[in-house]
Amino acid sequence: MTAARAPWGWAVAGALAGVLPAIVAFAPAQWLTQRLGAATGGQVQLTEARGTIWTGSAQLVLTGGGASQDSAALPGRLEWQLRPSWNGLRLQINATCCTPQPLLAQVRVQLGQVRLALQDSRSQWPAAVLAGLGTPWNTLQPQGQLMLQTQGLEAVWSAGRMALAGRAQLDAMSMSSRLSTLRPMGSYRLELTGGEVPALALSTLQGPLQLTGSGQWVSQRLRFAGEASAAPDREAALANLLNIIGRRSGARSLITVG
């Protein structure tokens, strides 16, 4: 009986050897969208996906996750190319609305580590899409442009922990909110610096709403402390916003995370 079944066993093995590469090569883009949604708790979604996991496009949507009804879509479509390399994957992302040049990244898996390195880049994103993330963004309803620059940015996951190297700078330009009649309220800079203890710094570039703060990632958690205040002649116009974004302490609003 064993000898009689052997040819069938080889036939099945041969069929699988031919079919599995084809399945991987033509895996639909929906496979990628499902995994991204699961990994982010549903807060980052790719909808209306077309193509394959290797070359495809979709609509990028931010949501509040879970049962939240909040969602906001990035204008235009997000396009990607994923290519295998000898020690990992090469990723190219292009957003028609926001990336003058494609974003390039390299994923490497080695010695129990996963390493994601982002090539130095510049991009510009609409702040309005943040409202899709739910509280507090759905209340703030921010408007403006988010200008992102990265330099030597690299994340390494090992033994359940993440290490960060390089830096990123996010300039929030000409920002406004439905909670204030001021248009704009100001422009701001958020700087991320990697290292043994990654650090975050918030500063005001210009405007009547003054924001400052600093934070660090300690034990994989962000601890941030900052404050918001209004220029003396703009306190009434910014009162509602100051009440929402932090805990009032006189003319200031104290912001804490973690």
Regions found by a protein language model. Name each.
Residues 1-14, 33-39, 180-258:
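Extended terminal
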Residues 16-61:
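N-terminal amphipathic/hydrophobic interface segments
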Residues 44-139, 151:
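N-terminal beta-strand/beta-hairpin edge segment
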Residues 52, 72-74, 142, 184-186, ...:
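Residues that define the transmembrane beta-barrel architecture of outer-membrane proteins
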Residues 59-61, 81, 94, 147-149, ...:
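Residue-level recognition of well-ordered beta-strand positions that form the cores
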Residues 88-96, 113-121, 159, 163-168, ...:
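Short, well-ordered strand-loop elements centered on a beta-strand within folded domains, enriched
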Residues 100-102, 107-155, 194-201, 229-258:
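Extended amphipathic, helix-rich lipid-handling scaffolds
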Residues 156-198:
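Short helix-loop boundary/capping segments
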